[in-house]
Amino acid sequence: MINLKLDNETFELRNEANEITLKEFNKIYTILQSQTLGKLEQYCEVFKTLGLPEAIIYDMDNDSFIELIKSFNAMTITSELPAKEIELNGYKYVAYTGDEFKFKTKDLIEIEKSAKRGVTNFPSFILAIIFKRADLTVNEHYEKSHLELKAKLFEDNVKADFAIPYITLVAKKTLKSLEDGK
């Protein structure tokens, strides 16, 4: 949490992954991926998403704003190990068994499709694709409406720190594929 003191008033800006909801994280992700916003405007939108008043943001001097961006980006990640399973609404969702997470080809195909479609809640979709219920068939699991419903379920029930290890794995896998020319 960043405490920002301006004009004799203190404002709190959440910048830790365990303080930010997955729904907010989806918005932040979409803002930071925007091709139409400049970098400063992106951070203005991010800070507004996290509750900092627009008037305060736009009234800051540039040096203070840049320092705020640097402080915000100093987020600490508490765990790099992805969760194996989670229970939501009475259902157990499992990402992997065994000691280590490995991508399934179908998961990567669906993640790639979601990215190309430009879904606005891409981090939630990553979780929706990776976490599966044992009582569903493969076809049921990958059904678009099921994935949308499950993405919303994750948005409503987890913080960003739950999703970040998986997003990191997807990013690393994508970079490796690009480096390998795949």
Predicted segments with their positions:
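Charged interaction scaffolds used for protein-protein
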Residues: M1-K182
